[in-house]
Design a protein with these regions (language model features):
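Phosphate-binding loop of NTP-binding sites
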Residues: 15-18, 57-61, 70-130
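ATP-dependent carboxylate-amine ligase
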Residues: 1-49, 61-66, 84-87, 118, ...
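Glycine-centered flexibility sites
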Residues: 2-9, 53, 71, 109-112
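Conserved beta-strand termini and adjacent loop/short-helix elements that scaffold enzyme active sites
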Residues: 26, 51-55, 92
Length: 130
């Protein structure tokens, strides 16, 4: 729900399609507004079903998983429909954590993330050389 223009929905769509998911992309923006995002999906776009410029309630009643763009308000009537029909609500981060099989190291905070990430990289390269 919400392909978006900034890349998150695009990467998630490509990953889902690559792994054989049956994908419906629905966004309130129309095809013209999303043309660059659709183009970025590339050859995989033909595997998806698009509902653009509107949402269809049936999509939220019949799909098992709804991947929600962070810009979509939590009180959206379509998310309520999905919840009422027992769909799992996911986002790109929750999908990543669900399907990533490797250990994850996360670095958060206001300052020092790049330095900390570089130190972690340095330590791991010494411990696990290729």
């Amino acid at each position: 729900m919400g392909l978006g223009l900034l890349g998150g929905g695009i990467a998630t769509t490509k990953w889902l399609l690559k792994h054989g998911a049956k994908v419906t992309i629905t966004d309130l923006k129309d095809k013209k507004a999303l043309s660059s995002s659709i183009k970025t999906i590339g050859k995989h776009a033909k595997l998806a079903r698009f509902v653009l410029g509107r949402h269809d309630e049936k999509d939220f009643k019949t799909n098992e998983i709804i991947v929600v763009n962070p810009a979509v308000p939590k009180e959206s009537k379509f998310l309520k429909i999905a919840r009422d029909h027992k769909a799992k609500l996911e986002n790109e981060a929750s999908l990543f954590f669900r399907f990533c099989e490797n250990p994850i190291i996360a670095v958060t905070g206001t300052r020092g993330k790049t330095t900390t990430a570089n130190w972690i990289r340095h330590i791991l390269k010494q411990k696990y050389p290729r």
